[in-house]
Amino acid sequence: ETLKESTQQSLWIELFAGGRYSSHSTNDLRKESLEKFLTNAVDLTGFLTKDEFRRLADPELYEGQSKVDLDLNDSGQADITAEQRQERAKQLGAYLEGKDERIISVASGVYDSHSESYQLASNGFEGQKESTSFTQGVSVSLQGKGDKKPEGWRYYRARHLNDLVGAEQIAKEALART
């Protein structure tokens, strides 16, 4: 019944300055805003208490880091349409139709995300990561004894769409947990 879709971008920085550490984030990526954001972040870090134990890692610790592909990204995620997401959510709820006369309500959800990050440190560290995440699940409310209304749910998450547990199994488990 309700379909929501969004795209988000943000910048997150960690500062190690003068023996102090701070982290800052913003989703305002306009050049003039970023300049002020960075200036303020550096200035604010100067007000913090020094922390002798918080510092950049020794470059020897990440020298020769592996370039192995950890298979964190499903390249097909970008091709999934809003209609396909809606159909998957409907399928989750459809498996519960008529399964128990005590069912009051069913809510299903399908979520997927794509994330890219790039890290660069002043001590020479450089790294990047790209990953996807897929989640689908359902919650169900039943009419219990008297005015009790127990609720059960089941959600699964995977890095790749094809690795997700099927809609029928998810629906059965949610009902069994109620």
Q: Which sequence ranges carry the predicted segments?
A:
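Active-site bordering "gate/hinge" segments
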Residues: 1-178
